[in-house]
A protein has these predicted regions:
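ATP-dependent helicase/translocase motor core
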Residues: 2-148, 157-169, 186, 194, ...
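P-loop (Walker A) phosphate-binding loop of NTP-binding proteins
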Residues: 150, 176
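Conserved glycine(s) of the Walker
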Residues: 154
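A short beta-strand-to-loop transition that corresponds to the Sensor-1 phosphate-sensing loop
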Residues: 177, 236-240, 263, 287-291
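Conserved helix-turn-beta segment of the N-terminal RecA-like "Helicase ATP-binding" lobe
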Residues: 179-218
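Switch/connector loops and helix/strand junctions flanking conserved nucleotide-binding motifs
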Residues: 181-183, 243-244, 293-298
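Conserved RecA-like ASCE ATPase "motif II neighborhood" in helicase/translocase motors
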Residues: 216-259, 266-274
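Post-DEXD/H (motif II) to motif III coupling segment of the RecA-like Helicase ATP-binding lobe
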Residues: 258, 266-309
């Protein structure tokens, strides 16, 4: 059986500092039934019409999905993957969503599913345990919290689960390296496995978060504030925040309801103290594989969950 993968639908702005929202993931369609036209082709899969056209002004009006390609498609070109996809002309998920609209879409859309076996996937025991501890802490936080999850237990999916299940207003995620910043950006914008058909921990009706990634300095505090206000989640390095002018640091401090510090054990005590002194302590949650820093000092903050190896 031949198939073709249709590109994702997303909104993206910015070059160095990027804001991204995934509106719909890739769609894999079956090529068994294809209608060819002089300007376009229509693939019919499970009764749904997917139109691919080389001309943005000529397409099947009845098709709910219309995709612009670099040339007139044919069934053989689709089978050979000899077509470049340009952009979506028409898609059921082409919507305008504000950060508040995204949060509202998460209400009652999270399922606390424990993984039973490969046929019944869900959150693992350490993930579900940490999530319950986080949600309990977030109801009435009074101090910084620490979640200890050993490597391989699914720390990132725990953060994603807390974001959606806790309906966090706006989250700052700090990481120690540029590489990890990019990895987490890719995870947060897709919600990892949470919305995949295999897991269905988050309902398909829930919108993907609007995620910002800061990789370079802003010209001024107003530009930074405008960037943050467009996002549900902002991911950056502690170094970016530390090197920002004081006025911009104040914007970071005042703009977020929650601050997730990933790989906290990699941060030396002096850097952590400088960072944590800026933010209200109750907003801070450290995620770490060990309660001890690489410099040998113990992490501060209340350990709300510690999963043993």
């Amino acid at each position: 059986m031949s198939t073709f993968v249709l590109m994702e639908l997303c909104k993206q702005s910015g070059v160095k500092n990027v804001i991204y929202q995934l509106l719909a993931p890739n769609i894999t369609i079956n090529l068994d039934e294809v209608e060819e036209n002089r300007s376009y082709a229509v693939v019919i899969d499970k009764g749904i019409r997917y139109c691919l056209t080389g001309n943005p002004g000529i397409y099947d009006e009845e098709a709910p999905y219309v995709l612009l390609t670099d040339r007139t498609p044919t069934k053989q070109k689709l089978i050979d993957n000899d077509i470049r996809q340009r952009k979506w002309i028409k898609h059921p998920n082409q919507i305008e969503a504000s950060p508040d609209g995204v949060i509202n879409s998460w209400e009652n859309r999270f399922h606390f599913k424990l993984e039973e076996n490969e046929e019944n996937p869900g959150l693992r025991k350490p993930q579900l345990g940490a999530l319950h501890a986080l949600l309990s802490h977030m109801l009435a936080p009074t101090e910084a919290a620490t979640v200890v999850l050993p490597t391989g237990t699914g720390k990132t999916e725990t953060m994603l689960s807390a974001l959606v299940a806790g309906r966090c207003n706006r989250v700052l995620v700090t990481v120690p390296t540029n590489a990890l910043r990019g990895q987490l950006f890719n995870k947060f914008k897709t919600l990892g496995v949470l919305k995949t058909p295999k897991f269905e921990i988050v309902d398909k009706e829930a919108l993907y978060p609007i995620v910002g990634m800061i990789t370079s300095a802003f010209e001024g505090a107003d530009q930074l504030k405008n960037f943050i206000e467009q996002c549900n989640v902002v991911i950056t390095t502690m170094q970016i925040i530390d090197s920002a002018p004081e006025e911009q640091q104040n914007v970071f401090v005042s703009s977020f309801s929650n601050v997730f510090v990933d790989e906290a054990h990699h941060i030396v005590a002096t850097s952590w103290r400088k960072f944590s002194d800026r933010f209200p302590r109750h907003q801070l949650v450290q995620f770490t594989a060990t309660p001890f820093r690489n410099d040998g000092q113990r992490l501060d903050g209340k350990i709300i969950f510690n999963y043993p190896l």
